Amino acid sequence: MEGPEIKFAEAVLDNGKYGTRTVRFEAGRLAQQAQGAVAAYLDEDTMLLSATSVGKHPKDNFDFFPLTIDVEERSYAAGKIPGSFFRREGRPSTEAILVCRLIDRPLRPSFITGLRNEVQVVITVLSIAPDEFYDSLAINAASASSMLSGIPFSGPIAGVRLALIGDQWVVFPKHSQLKEAVFDITVAGRVVTDSEGNEDVAIMMVEAEATEGAWDLIQGGATKPDEAIVAQGLEAAKPFIQQLVAAQASLAQQAAKPTVDYPVFLPYAQETYDAVSALALDELGTVYQTADKIERQDADDALKTRTKEAVAAKVEAGELPQSALTEFSAAYKSVTKTVVRGRILRDGVRMDGRGLADIRPLDAEVQVIPRVHGSAIFQRGETQILGVTTLNMLKMEQQIDSLSPITKKRYLHHYNFPPYSTGETGRVGSPKRREIGHGFLAERALVPVLPSREDFPYAIRQVSEALGSNGSTSMGSVCASTLSLLNAGVPLRAPVAGIAMGLVSDTVDGQVRYAALTDILGAEDALGDMDFKVAGTSEFVTAIQLDTKLDGIPTSVLDGALKQAKEARTAILGVLNQAIDGPDEMAPTAPRVISVNIPVDKIGELIGPKGKTINAIQDETGADISIEEDGTVYIGAVDGPSADAARAQVNAIANPTNPEVGESFLGTVVKIATFGAFVSLLPGKDGLLHISEVRKLAGGKRVENVEDVLGVGQKILVEITKIDDRGKLSLAPVLEETADQEGRDAASHGSEAPAEG
């Protein structure tokens, strides 16, 4: 039996010294009953199947386009059996949900306006190489299958992920390559042609972040991902997008079905719009100059009711068709949009009276909830976010069972959007896709500035509660997270703030004019063309998310919006720094976590037979102990004394020569520094005799140079005064008179306890 004819097209993307990546699209063999189906390959080992299906009958009672994107991660794709009780895949992973949103954002505006037939795009991960991402490949697969489906679709849409490694943007990077990268960006766009026939790529979606290791790389001299570098990344994506668009177009020429003339339900007829405009246009201009959200909504609701009654009267009188009643809401919204956008483009004034680049009033406060480990409130206008931080041992970090090589995550950000935040009623409970997406965006914004596991061995859960919403609660969550984390004592490398930018565009005198808006309101988001969220430190960008309702946005416009966002971010960081300018002391209710390094061959001895030894230590001290494969032991307890007691017992078993606070040693000076001297106590155990302690050896006189008092190789009697959480030793000199006095005291008291010093 002869098999089906397979049509294919491919694009070979050149990464220079990093080699090439081949993206291949095939059609004709798999999912033959779907309206459009494409198998997409990244090199040889990663394979996705995208199937686009369309309902036979329109949902004419819907006033929106019923598009559903589903990503199905199959465990067999990575050679795994699911870890659930029934050993089969369950609900989508967080990664799958985020990829669904990533695909939906550029695809949705590409279908014909007014389509009411249900459209479903299902992307199934059939095979994935261990070190690969599949998200940007999925954007291309979904676009390609939609191109073949016969649905009116203004594609192709292409998506690429790029990583900035050194001074090169590498397309379709691998997980392991991100360790060398400072910035990671995913861009989706389409190819557009201007009136002179010149081709360019219009950007439709951006998702980007600084990598987890970006801070250390930047400190080591790597390129800092500021606004100019991000703009370069958008430009670097264009040629790769053009190649992938060309490959999809080639496949569509071979295998696309004829475009079907599906019924299109336009939101309103022109006569309905004209009637609503005549009745409401002037009053809308007044309503949308009201700064207060609730007052504006009340005035708008009253005007809308009066206008609808007037339209109903015209229908009853035969002046308008019956359909005008069902078209009224869409027409009213369109007139509102015309009023708001016209004032912005014409006068440079927004509905609450602000200029294009003005920020609403800001307020920030920390330590607002008792007993929690860290808390803060950040307010921008009517948007109010409560941030709450919880710390625990690293064994409480999230364990991840997905197709990604990442198996655990110690920083979690969870975002909640209750209905009362907008003064409404609604369902509460498990998070929706939007909440998961917003939480992940705010999480990515903070990851680059978190302290390392070694410096801060805690699992961190950050929760953002949207208590009030009128524009960009996700960027408000970034600001609240910075405040709350610092209040909890987390030593962030730098504070992070976020701002949401909007865009209004229209054709004026034959030219498309754009106006970028800083700190958009909820209504400006709904009535505008773009939602562009930018988070970062004072020095570089840490996270970006772009959505647009247009066919695409020129990179020059995005470059200008990035620069405008930097000014706003700098102003917000000033407010955050006034509220808290560094990490606070950890709350008394927070656990204390310290670390001890033991020889790997001592791990078994510390655990004991069937865990007997480690369990006994935990029971006796009340501490929790976890052991890493490299011999790092994390000890967590409700207070410092319990943690210290557990550390002493661990050292007694695994590091019997480890010194303790209060012990005296005759040490040897091994190194002189400007701030003190390093003294060797035992093999591999050095401590610092700070210059303030060296003064005691000089009779309390000021010491300008440590070399004037001590020299390398000199013997000195010292006492351990402190062991910090990383095992570093602080020393003090034991003076002769002190030692003699202690000896006399001990002799006079005999067997009694020694006198207090």
From Swiss-Prot:
Any idea which GO molecular function terms this record carries? 3'-5'-RNA exonuclease activity; magnesium ion binding; polyribonucleotide nucleotidyltransferase activity; RNA binding
* Record's catalysed reaction(s): RNA(n+1) + phosphate = RNA(n) + a ribonucleoside 5'-diphosphate
Limits of the KH domain: 591-650
Which Gene3D superfamilies would you find in this protein's record? Answer: GHMP Kinase, N-terminal domain, K Homology domain, type 1, Nucleic acid-binding proteins
The subcellular location is:
Cytoplasm
Which cofactors, by name?
Answer: Mg(2+)
- The residue ranges of the S1 motif domain are 662-734
Highest taxon above the source species? Bacteria
Q: Give the matching Pfam families.
A: KH_1 (PF00013), PNPase (PF03726), RNase_PH (PF01138), RNase_PH_C (PF03725), S1 (PF00575)
Q: Which keywords does UniProt give here?
A: Cytoplasm, Magnesium, Metal-binding, Nucleotidyltransferase, RNA-binding, Transferase
- Gene Ontology CC terms, in alphabetical order: cytosol
Q: Which residues form a coiled coil?
A: none
Kind of enzyme, top EC level? transferase
Q: Where does Mg(2+) bind?
A: D525, D531
EC number of this enzyme:
2.7.7.8
Q: Which GO terms describe its biological process?
A: mRNA catabolic process; RNA processing
Residue numbers spanned by region Disordered: 737-757
Q: Which family does it belong to?
A: Belongs to the polyribonucleotide nucleotidyltransferase family.
**What biological function has been recorded for the protein in this entry?**
Involved in mRNA degradation. Catalyzes the phosphorolysis of single-stranded polyribonucleotides processively in the 3'- to 5'-direction.
Q: What is this protein called?
A: Polyribonucleotide nucleotidyltransferase
Q: Which organism is it from?
A: Clavibacter michiganensis subsp. michiganensis (strain NCPPB 382)
Classification lineage = Bacteria, Bacillati, Actinomycetota, Actinomycetes, Micrococcales
